[in-house]
Design a protein with these regions (language model features):
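C-terminal all-alpha effector/ligand-binding and dimerization domain
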Residues: 111-175
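Non-transmembrane, amphipathic alpha-helical segments
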Residues: 2, 33-40, 60, 81, ...
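Solenoid-repeat scaffolds in large eukaryotic assemblies
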Residues: 65, 85, 106, 152-153
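Short linear motifs at protein or domain termini
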Residues: 1-47
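Hydrophobic, amphipathic alpha-helical faces that serve as interaction scaffolds
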Residues: 44-60, 88-127
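Amphipathic alpha-helical segments enriched in hydrophobic/aromatic residues interleaved with Lys/Arg
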Residues: 64-78
Length: 175
């Protein structure tokens, strides 16, 4: 005999498993091994992270802004000391998603970016010079600090456009 509460639990668990299956299928479809796979992931990132940056800018508190600045400082420290900075960059992007106030956006980005060390592999293909990397987040963080959601979205999308341009150059060099 199954209670109403038990039925509800089983239905929620079934729905959760279906969502995880669909998310895993998306990840498999957008293989990290191909140019088109990386471009697909970049397109999804632009949608999710553009929204996240806008929402973050519109709701951020000074204490949270300082956390973003600290993550940016960690990122700059890493690349200035010869490291790729992938982990620090990922932390910054996920913090912006967290500060958007949308747990769903954060979960989707974590799923897309952390599966099979995807972010480090993405970063390896997309990043070309330390100078570009050092300046890449500055205008985004300034828009967030100003509380300008529309500008923050635009800056995030512009940032990811630069990543896309670097991806194209990376794959052109491999052909």
């Amino acid at each position: 005999i199954l209670t109403t509460q038990g039925e509800r639990f089983l239905e929620e668990e079934r729905a959760r498993r279906e969502k995880m299956k669909a998310a895993n299928e998306l990840i498999e479809a957008a293989s990290m091994e191909t140019e088109s796979g990386l471009e697909d992931i970049l397109l999804v990132r632009k949608l999710l992270e553009g929204y996240a940056a806008e929402a973050c800018a519109e709701r951020i508190e000074p204490k949270e802004l300082q956390k973003l600045k600290d993550l940016q400082a960690d990122y700059l420290y890493a690349i200035r000391h010869g490291r790729a900075g992938s982990e620090e960059d990922l932390a910054l992007h996920l913090k912006i998603a967290h500060l958007s106030g949308s747990p769903s956006i954060l979960r989707m980005l974590k799923l897309i970016l952390t599966d099979q060390d995807a972010y480090a592999r993405f970063n390896q293909a997309a990043v070309r010079s330390d100078e570009v990397r050092e300046n890449e987040h500055e205008s985004l963080l300034a828009a967030i600090e100003a509380g300008d959601g529309a500008l923050a979205r635009w800056e995030m999308e512009r940032h990811l456009e630069h990543v896309g341009e670097n991806l194209q150059a990376y794959f052109a060099g491999r052909k």
